[in-house]
Every structure is written in C-alpha cells, then in structure tokens.
UniProtKB/Swiss-Prot annotation:
Glycans are attached at residues 260, 331. It comes from Mus musculus. This is Heparan sulfate glucosamine 3-O-sulfotransferase 3A1. InterPro entries: NST/OST, P-loop_NTPase, Sulfotransferase_dom. GO terms for molecular function: [heparan sulfate]-glucosamine 3-sulfotransferase activity. Its main location: Golgi. Residues 1-24 are cytoplasmic. It comes from the Eukaryota. Residues 85-121 are annotated as: Disordered.
Amino acid sequence: MAPSGPTGAQPSPAEPLSRSIFRKFLLMLCSLLTSLYVFYCLAERCPPGSGPVAGVPGRGVPAGPRELAMWPAGAPRKRLLQLRQRRRRGRSGPGDSSDQEEQSPGLAAAPGGSGAGSSVAEAQPGTLALLLDEGSKQLPQAIIIGVKKGGTRALLEFLRVHPDVRAVGAEPHFFDRSYHKGLAWYRDLMPRTLEGQITMEKTPSYFVTREAPARISAMSKDTKLIVVVRDPVTRAISDYTQTLSKRPDIPSFESLTFRNRSAGLIDTSWSAIQIGLYAKHLEPWLRHFPLGQMLFVSGERLVSDPAGELRRVQDFLGLKRIITDKHFYFNQTKGFPCLKKAEGSGKPHCLGKTKGRAHPTIAREVLRQLRDFYRPFNRKFYQMTGRDFGWDG
C-alpha cells in the first residue's frame, strides 16, 4: 500500500470525505484566529492619538450616521462606560481626583455611581475605542431643584437606573453657593454622557434660593425643572429629625415651631417651617420658566407608587418608559420602596440607613395648628400647579 501524503493532501479513497472537510475547517479557523491575534496586538500598540478615527469624538473625524448605527444600545453602552471608569479608578493615584468615581451619599455600597468631581475614564487604546463613543461633559438638561426632605434623593437614585440618564451623585450647590466659580467649573462636575443621554443633578436648596431661577435661566431657558414636594408638616418634622440626629442638644420641635406659643404664632423664620411655604417659593420660578417646563412630583406617591411617579418623570424628560414596577420591591422594615437592581449593580439596594428614620412624637395640638397655618399656602400651591396633593384631607 502506498504511504499517506502530507497533511492537507488529497484524501486516499479509503479516507472518509468528512474527515478531510473537518481538517480543512480546522486549518481555516487557526488562520483566522492567528490573524485576529496579530491585528489585536498591533491595535494595542497604537497610541490613542496616533491619527483620526472615524466615529470617535475628539479623535479626528466626527461620528456619522453609519458609525452611530453600529454603536451599542443605551444600556450596554452605559455599563461599558462604568466598567472602564472602575478600571481606571483602580489605576489612579490618590491625588488624581478627576478620575475618582462618585459615591452617592444615598445608596449604600452601590458600585458604579457617578457624581461630582468625577469623569468617565478615557477609553483604553485598542479595538474598543473604535466602537465606543467616550462621551463628553455637558451642562445639565434637567435639575431636581427641591425640596429638602421631600424625596429628592430617592427620585435621583431611581432615575439613575435608566440607561439614558447620567447624574451627579453629590449635590453640586452651584446656583446657590458656587456660582462665582463659573459654568466651566460646573460642567466639569458632570459625568460624561453619550449621544441620546441626558445629564442631571439635584440640589434641593435651589428651590428656596432667590437667585437660582434667574441663574438657571441664564444658563439655559430650556432647562427642565423637577420639584419633589411633600406634606409641609411631615416635611418639617423630617427636617427637624435630621438636624436632631446631628445636634442632639437642640430645643424641642414645639419650642422651635412657635414664635409665641400662647398666642399660637408660628415662627416662619425657622427654615424647617419656611421651606414648606411652597407657593411663596414657586412665584420667582414662574417669572423665569413656564409652568410646562416644571414637573411637581408627589413625595407621598413616590413611596406608595414609585413606578407611577417615575412614569410621569420619564415622560416629562422625553425618556422611554424603562423604569417600571419590576424595578422595585417594598422594604417592610424601612417602610420604603427599594431598587431590585441599583445602577451598576446586579444586587438589590435600599437607600441609606437614615431613610425611614423614626420621627419624634409631636403633640396633636401642635400638628393641628401647623396644618391650619399651612392650609392657605397649600391651596394656593394647588392652584398654581394645577394639582391637588391632598395634604389637607
């Protein structure tokens, strides 16, 4: 019998045809893998700024419709950006604050957050940079402007689940405390966003800051404003409870509430009381923004029906309704809805340990007098916003 030929030669009549096909397939596969490996090695050696790359902003040729169509959808893009941010953070030294990941004060141990003073890390050189837009920092298109202890932190954390929302975790306090630093400084606080994503921030004190409406309007008259409001009586008690946890030696709630207890005069100079005068604080905002550019979210419904309120918010922001009932579960211990999966994490997360903190017991007569005091302000607020929040029922 004649000896067999070398590998890849024509099969002998006795050799099955399938074995020959399989052998050729293996050769082609090995060649393909070798070529891909060589291409990958060469790409990794190329410096990030070696030349214009189509479709990558800041690297030459701007992205066109063809490149945009090839980019991943919103959610995968957001996860990839967060992954690159965490990797870059691991390599950064302690003094490199520009690459530090923001830590939201509200969501305990929630990885992948985004907030003040941070930036998404630059794309690593190589093939990923050809497919991913690294994004850019933008001034916020939407701001949660109030109110303190109304549920602003919960709303922001819920919104950050949406793949098209990028938000600062910490409160920037730009329009009330740091306006002198300029818009460039403010923009640098923002996270990077991709095409189709919106930038957000929340600072509840803006709502009661006299200069804030004009300053935000000067930045952009198209800014969308969200106000989370809550029964002013329970809001005041919650405000006091937070202060009490930091300063246990402060006077009682009752003594701070009244300017003259025997006459029943409420002390409106106390910030816990003054913030609840929503109608008064809303007036300057309506001089700079149309009512249709503002959304008033019920803090009570954010607890009882978070998906319903988030549906309104998503519609207001022009976002696809992605956040639904399936994203929430009710924590019986805290008496508050929690996220089944927080941003950048596959694990359930509730807001921080202060959420659901027990309030001190307030005398019924004090509560009655406070409700009587707030009633005319509440009714005016209902008329101004076109929504009855039911605080006087």
